[in-house]
């Protein structure tokens, strides 16, 4: 993405999809640009590694925006760097299907809180995790977390469609989905506020309660 000709070629391909009716494009990976690579601008990956996802986000976001009716559309990006705040939105990548350590549901929340403190208003995650089949109890617990995030997605390597799990799980999924639809006026209002004031939708507690010493130590609530 340091080559303008490549960017134009890529954007033309994306624009064809948008004109077909696609409204969102997944901006996957982007964080693995090799340090020893040589880029079109003559610089090595040592200098370009972090710029790669920024340029990737920008190229895709511009293609989606410029090809969409009323300049609407969204990217669903995994990698980012300083400046990617302009190109919403991002998600937490491939989470493990557990609730321990730094890679499962708790790790996703920690990442989302950190992301919000870095100036990103919108952030999402894969409900239930991605890597392996999610345990029923974990996926159920992940549902309200996912539906009460700004953008909601169920996605994973094994199928995550609720009707493939059980009837009772489908009922729980539907209940959370209906809850979010009822809350959409509030969600839209908060989204507008966040874009105007630079706030994250998922906020670390000390953003709202800076005088509370305990809020500065809390990493599993928002």
Language model regions located:
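Catalytic-domain carbohydrate-binding cleft regions of carbohydrate-active enzymes
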Residues: 1-222
